[in-house]
């Protein structure tokens, strides 16, 4: 299959380039900028896109355009730093901009296949402190903004393009059309990426690989693992065994909902009740990083024991399926090549595959979350399961600030349930990316009836986001928040105050721990 290969130069938006291209029906993959010639050629590239990045081309050890990229003789598009790197490569001049450009700018464009079907002026999103001061020989201007005279360029052959703005972000008008024009008009690539074809290929692939053996799956009830469970069921039926671990850190009635949802889908699941074990291991622990590690290790132990019992019972379990997504693969590749600052330990059960005697199946390892949701819809997963808000692997433990106790879990489950219930009642649930309640480790004075109270505080958090990398706090109606706060204080024993978190990401993370 022909592929649009995106080389990553470090931009926070790089994954969006791949997603935008795929959304238009063309297969794309992401590689680090210093990937080998063989890595790129193995993908059968039809076009190359160079992402943006934080470096300056004149810095020591700055990422550069590898020679072999030019030797491939296929169309190239450089975005932001990618543009500057191309200009530098061909002998042009890049310097610090006299005025940094961050945010909206008006782009004026000339007639060109890259801008076919677009108006002569439109808004784009800039994010750069360097700019091109002189074009290399053989290049010409096809777009300019007030502060970037070379905001869009190409060579005279029309095979190498560069744009100073970011077409991959939603802030750029017609950005997806620009990327599509590059792939279809410039690179002459035919559409080759369709979810129905992918599903059929994966089902056949799983059947061929697994044969008559059995597959176990760690089922959380979230979107990724639920869609994997459904795909495995379509492929191998009862030879797929989903395992659901009840950690005691789930939302109110979540175990019952998961069991009921999969009963309706006709899929049998194995439920392991490990509530007491998780709570016992967490006793007295307040540090969030320590809580995550304990939960991760406990989950591995519980899942391992359950798997060994099933192996003893069935004998022919040979595979472990995981809901690994493309961003997980990308992040692991990045971390292999360079050290990255760790903000939180992620609960992706990292030690599980090494401990279990099974081969790994990851049917979605090259998919993004929105693509998995599309597959779920095609396979018949109910909308309420497809559109569920993200839920952290450690569960409510990272929404209880401080020690996790039975009392805190019950209070938080009830408060969170009220918040989500009201969001759904008021048609707001699908309008926010994620919403939840947080149990705070403080008490406050209050008055109920004629009595003084000294009870717990609940924080509400709701954010709008595209992919969780950045997020804005949701401007929920005041009347709605008032109603939720009243219900929580009146219906949840032990709570006398409710606050609303109005911090965006950055500087805060979405979860409190």
Swiss-Prot record:
Record keyword Ligase present: yes
Catalytic activity, as annotated: XMP + L-glutamine + ATP + H2O = GMP + L-glutamate + AMP + diphosphate + 2 H(+)
Organism: Thermosipho africanus (strain TCF52B)
Residues reported in the UniProt entry to bind ATP: 220-226
Keyword Ligase: yes
Residues annotated as catalytic: 80, 166, 168
Oligomeric form and interacting partners: Homodimer.
EC numbers: 6.3.5.2
Gene name of the encoded protein: guaA
Listed name of the protein: GMP synthase [glutamine-hydrolyzing]
Domain Glutamine amidotransferase type-1 as annotated: residue spans: 3-192
Pathway: Purine metabolism; GMP biosynthesis; GMP from XMP (L-Gln route): step 1/1
Keywords noted in UniProt: ATP-binding, Glutamine amidotransferase, GMP biosynthesis, Ligase, Nucleotide-binding, Purine biosynthesis
Gene Ontology cellular-component annotations: cytosol
Task performed by this protein: Catalyzes the synthesis of GMP from XMP.
Enzyme class name: ligase
GO MF terms, alphabetically ordered: ATP binding; GMP synthase activity
GMPS ATP-PPase domain mapped to chain residues: 193-388
InterPro entries referenced in this protein's UniProt entry, alphabetically: Class_I_gatase-like, GATASE, GMP_synth_C, GMP_synth_GATase, GMP_synthase, GMPS_ATP_PPase_dom, NAD/GMP_synthase, Rossmann-like_a/b/a_fold
């Amino acid at each position: 299959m022909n592929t649009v290969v995106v080389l990553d130069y470090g931009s926070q938006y790089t994954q969006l380039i791949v997603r935008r291209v795929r959304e238009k029906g063309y297969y794309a993959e992401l590689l680090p900028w210093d990937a080998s010639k063989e890595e790129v050629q193995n993908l059968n590239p039809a076009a190359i896109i160079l992402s943006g990045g934080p470096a300056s081309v004149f810095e020591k050890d700055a990422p550069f355009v590898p020679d072999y990229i030019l030797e491939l003789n296929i169309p190239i598009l450089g975005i932001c730093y990618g543009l500057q790197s191309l200009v530098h490569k061909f002998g042009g001049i890049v310097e610090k901009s006299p005025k940094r450009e961050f945010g909206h700018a008006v782009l004026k464009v000339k007639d060109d296949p890259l801008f076919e079907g677009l108006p002569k002026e439109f808004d784009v999103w800039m994010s750069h402190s360097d700019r091109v001061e002189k074009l290399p020989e053989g290049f010409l201007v096809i777009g300019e903004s007030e502060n970037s005279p070379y905001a869009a360029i190409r060579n005279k052959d029309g095979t190498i393009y560069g744009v100073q703005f970011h077409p991959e972000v939603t802030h750029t008008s017609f950005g997806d059309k620009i990327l599509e024009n590059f792939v279809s008009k410039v690179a002459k690539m035919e559409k080759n990426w369709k979810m129905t074809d992918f599903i059929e290929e994966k089902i056949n692939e799983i059947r061929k690989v697994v044969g008559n053996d059995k597959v176990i799956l760690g089922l959380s009830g979230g979107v990724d693992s639920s869609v994997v469970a459904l795909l495995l069921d379509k492929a191998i039926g009862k030879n797929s065994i989903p395992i659901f671990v009840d950690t005691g850190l789930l939302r109110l009635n979540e175990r019952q909902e998961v069991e009921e949802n999969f009963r309706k889908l006709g899929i049998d699941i194995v439920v392991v009740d490990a509530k007491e074990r998780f709570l016992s291991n967490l006793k007295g622990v307040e540090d969030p990083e320590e809580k995550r590690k304990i939960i991760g290790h406990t989950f591995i132990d519980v899942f391992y024991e359950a798997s060994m019992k099933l192996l003893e019972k069935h004998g022919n379990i040979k595979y472990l399926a995981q809901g690994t997504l493309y961003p997980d693969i990308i992040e692991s590749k990045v971390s292999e090549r360079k050290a990255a600052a760790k903000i939180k330990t992620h609960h992706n059960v990292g030690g599980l595959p090494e401990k279990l005697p099974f081969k790994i199946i990851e049917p979605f390892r090259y998919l993004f979350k929105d693509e998995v949701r599309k597959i779920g819809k095609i396979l018949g997963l109910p909308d309420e399961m497809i559109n569920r808000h993200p839920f952290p692997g450690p569960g409510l433990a990272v929404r209880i600030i401080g020690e996790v106790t039975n009392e805190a879990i019950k209070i938080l489950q009830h408060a969170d349930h009220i918040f989500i219930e009201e969001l759904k009642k008021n048609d707001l649930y699908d309008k926010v990316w994620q919403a939840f309640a947080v149990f705070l480790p403080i008490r406050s004075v209050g008055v109920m009836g004629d009595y003084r109270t000294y009870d717990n505080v609940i924080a509400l958090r709701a954010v709008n986001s595209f992919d969780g990398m950045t997020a804005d706090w949701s401007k929920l109606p005041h009347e709605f928040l008032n109603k939720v706060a009243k219900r929580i204080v009146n219906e949840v024993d032990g709570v006398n105050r409710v606050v609303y978190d109005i911090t965006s990401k950055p500087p805060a993370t979405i979860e409190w721990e």
